[in-house]
């Protein structure tokens, strides 16, 4: 139900207030906050705020020399909602609420519903009129309504607005200027979406935006609200989607913010065992309180509707779901059923997703949820949380752990490559290589890779190729696409000077090529969440650290993916082939253009009639050391029954002509027979055991008998170390900064989210 925008009267049954107190005013920002309007022919601003425990509230600012009590508000519902109209106030005027607590103290608070705010270190709210912006993204909006959200391409470039690129000495671009710089780069690189770290107003740069004080105000660090509208509008016109991080899990204790808003808990849970994250130093919302539900759901819809944002990535969902999250014994209380689940938070998330996706089914609601909580991306009506995507933190942790391992020891960790297929299709996953993985001593992505300078690039290329082919949508944090060696810092721009070195430009070219290949081949995104879009060929060659699998699209087109996670050349590597014909190599991470050796290319490979891996035929290829290869699978041709009958008739006619000189014999009518081909029989045999069993074997490799192994694949070679680095690029491989950037408080591994504290 959409709240009205009619003139509000001092009546407790007023619709906006009634819906607000029921938890159902999902456009509360239209009523609360500061709004320019005309009363009795005089222009001014009406202020409204919710403060249930206050004994008095006044509006203060430059207009009254910040004098408490000079402009007192009055209750409009005889309960908790306060209002005041001040003639003569105008856009950009700064104000706060001076709240008198029940203890008699005065606290000065920023407006929770403010559309604009002062730039830190100042923290006052500003009057702002959102109306009047001319949008130009109608074509984008209409196209999005027809988009298949789940079965479409999604390749996200995650970025921090203030440190992607700066002008001058670390002076950030404003939102509109940033769009002009960003659009050509995103289009050239081929990403489909940009995801912004939080841009809701926040006081501390080192929190990266994850400690929010203004849930309705784009941070003024980068301009005005209309500047941010221009940012989104320009990206949409360029065909680029915009996702933003949204933080409903917790908020900071800054005295001007939501904390103890009227001297007592309003927005936070009043129970100290539920209302505070001591390790993070932040407060937890009271998810069961109706007014808080209206506040948060209004905030989410505000960004989607007023700023045309395409989706929200909901931060720290795991911390909302569990009462014992980051709490020791005695620091938490069980729920009414004796469990550790936060029942109110679960109900809130379901309500949030039902509301948003009910209004906008084409929007993205992405959960950053790091536990095994079931059915995160299933509808609330089926017992799920109602998101339509979830970050795959398990895949990320396993694969980064595997890639850090020296290739000599990867054989014993092969299950980390294959284990994700135990659960890959249980949720609608996004594969995230996010900002959290390149900060606080974890090292940049390329510095996680083992080996010398060239080996690091070869490992990273192999990993990117595997990631792009793995089922699930994709996300990569800025700077990793060209191999930044230093950890990310919010205090300075990316190390763009690295693109003056060949290895970095070649890696960037490789990522650009991968992104283009991804968009052009539906097999990589059309069936991401079903076994119908994926099939193992070689899951368990742990001794040689090789995997091979198929990705398929809805039309039956297939891409064969082969990954060699060892720096060893594999000549004569044989694997099963689903279709007979010629297999064309369409991407090779070891290509010279990408910084590889360029010594091995399979170009086109013919199948031979050697059954293997459950298929009637196989191919033999050469695997470059430390590489990912993509092959185009030939289209399977199926002749129609009529064609077969015609061929049979021609064959019979030839035989008859050849025997013409012999006495004619009575010819029997040809018998129609239907035989199951060997290929069909083999396929049936393979299907019988079930795909889940195949995934199980993949995740837990077993040693194959020596005879079978020799027949199936090329003999294993002892891994060799790669060549020593070239001296030319040594300056690019700079170490992480000696002086670490400011950072939020440390956090336990349960939710790998360093930035939330």
Where does each model-flagged region fall?
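Carbohydrate-interacting/catalytic domains
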Residues: 1-152, 176-186, 454-457, 468-476, ...
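Short, flexible loop/turn elements at secondary-structure junctions
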Residues: 51-53, 77, 88, 160-165, ...
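Short glycine-biased active-site loop of nucleotidyltransferases that positions the nucleotide triphosphate
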Residues: 74, 205-209, 253-260, 377-378, ...
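Substrate-binding/active-site clefts of carbohydrate-active enzymes
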Residues: 118, 138-151, 160-341
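Non-transmembrane alpha-helical segments in soluble domains
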Residues: 183, 232, 300-304, 353, ...
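Conserved alpha/beta catalytic core and glycan-binding cleft of carbohydrate-active enzymes
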Residues: 308-310, 325-491, 498, 519-590, ...
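Intrinsically disordered, polybasic Lys/Arg-rich low-complexity tracts
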Residues: 636-757
């Amino acid at each position: 139900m959409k709240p009205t925008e009619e003139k509000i009267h001092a009546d407790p049954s007023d619709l906006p207030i009634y819906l607000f107190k029921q938890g159902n005013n999902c456009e509360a920002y239209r009523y609360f906050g500061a709004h320019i309007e005309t009363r009795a022919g005089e222009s001014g601003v009406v202020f409204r705020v919710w403060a249930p425990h206050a004994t008095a509230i006044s509006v203060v600012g430059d207009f009254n020399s910040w004098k408490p009590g000079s402009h007192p508000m009055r209750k409009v519902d005889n309960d908790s909602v306060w209002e005041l109209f001040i003639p003569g106030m105008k856009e950009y005027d700064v104000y706060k609420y001076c709240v008198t607590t029940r203890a008699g103290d005065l606290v000065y608070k920023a407006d929770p519903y403010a559309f604009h705010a002062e730039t830190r270190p100042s923290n006052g709210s500003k009057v702002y009129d959102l109306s009047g912006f001319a949008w130009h993204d109608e074509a984008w909006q209409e196209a999005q309504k027809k988009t298949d959200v789940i079965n479409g391409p999604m390749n996200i470039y995650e970025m921090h607005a203030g440190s992607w690129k700066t002008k001058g000495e670390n002076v950030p671009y404003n939102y509109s200027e940033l769009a002009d710089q960003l659009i050509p780069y995103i289009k050239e690189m081929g990403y489909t979406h940009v995801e912004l770290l939080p841009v809701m107003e926040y006081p501390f740069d080192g929190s990266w935006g994850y400690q929010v004080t203004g849930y309705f105000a784009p941070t003024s660090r980068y301009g005005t609200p209309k500047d941010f509208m221009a940012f989104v509008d320009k990206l949409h016109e360029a065909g680029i989607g915009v996702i933003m991080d949204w933080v409903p899990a917790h908020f900071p204790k800054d005295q001007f913010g939501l904390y103890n808003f009227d001297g007592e808990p309003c927005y936070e849970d009043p129970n100290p065992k539920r209302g505070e994250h001591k390790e993070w130093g932040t407060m937890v919302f009271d998810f069961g309180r109706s007014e808080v539900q209206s506040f948060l759901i209004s905030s989410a819809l505000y960004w989607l509707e007023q700023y045309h944002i395409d989706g929200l990535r909901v931060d720290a969902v795991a911390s909302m779901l569990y009462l014992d999250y980051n709490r020791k014994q005695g620091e938490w209380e069980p729920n009414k059923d004796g469990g550790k689940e936060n029942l109110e938070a679960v109900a809130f998330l379901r309500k949030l997703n039902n509301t948003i996706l009910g209004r906008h089914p084409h929007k993205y609601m992405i959960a950053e949820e790091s536990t095994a909580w079931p059915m995160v991306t299933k509808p609330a009506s089926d017992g799920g949380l109602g998101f339509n995507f979830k970050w795959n933190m398990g895949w990320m942790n396993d694969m980064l752990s595997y890639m850090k391992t020296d290739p000599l020891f990867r054989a014993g960790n092969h299950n980390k490559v294959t284990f994700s297929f135990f659960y890959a299709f249980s949720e609608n996953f996004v594969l995230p290589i996010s900002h959290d993985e390149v900060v606080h001593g974890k090292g940049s992505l390329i510095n996680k890779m083992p080996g010398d300078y060239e080996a690091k690039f070869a490992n990273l290329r192999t990993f990117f190729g595997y990631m792009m082919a793995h089922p699930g949508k994709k996300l990569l944090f800025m700077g990793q696409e060209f191999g930044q060696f230093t950890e990310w810092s919010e205090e300075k721009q990316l190390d763009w000077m690295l693109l003056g070195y060949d290895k970095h430009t070649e890696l960037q070219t490789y990522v650009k090529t991968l992104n283009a290949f991804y968009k052009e081949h539906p097999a990589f995104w059309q069936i991401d969440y079903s076994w119908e879009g994926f099939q193992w060929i070689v899951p368990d060659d742990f001794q040689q650290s090789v995997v091979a699998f198929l990705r398929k699209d809805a039309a039956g087109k297939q891409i064969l993916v082969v990954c060699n996670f060892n720096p060893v050349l594999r000549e004569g590597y044989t694997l099963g082939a689903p279709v007979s014909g010629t297999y064309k190599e369409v991407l090779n991470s070891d290509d010279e253009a990408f910084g590889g050796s360029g010594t091995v290319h399979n170009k086109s490979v013919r199948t031979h009639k050697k059954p293997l891996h459950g298929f009637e035929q196989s191919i033999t290829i050469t695997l470059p050391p430390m590489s990912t290869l993509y092959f185009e699978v030939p289209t399977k041709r199926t002749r129609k029954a009529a064609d077969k009958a015609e061929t049979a008739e021609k064959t019979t006619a030839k035989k008859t002509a050849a025997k013409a000189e012999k006495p004619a014999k009575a010819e029997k009518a040809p018998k129609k027979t239907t035989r199951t081909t060997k290929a069909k029989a083999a396929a049936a045999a393979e299907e019988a055991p079930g795909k889940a069993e195949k995934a199980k074997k993949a995740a837990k490799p077993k040693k194959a008998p020596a005879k079978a192994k020799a027949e199936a694949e090329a003999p294993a070679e002892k891994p060799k170390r790669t060549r020593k680095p070239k001296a030319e690029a040594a300056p690019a491989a700079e170490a992480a900064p000696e002086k670490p950037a400011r950072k939020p408080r440390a956090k336990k591994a349960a939710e790998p989210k360093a930035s939330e504290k």
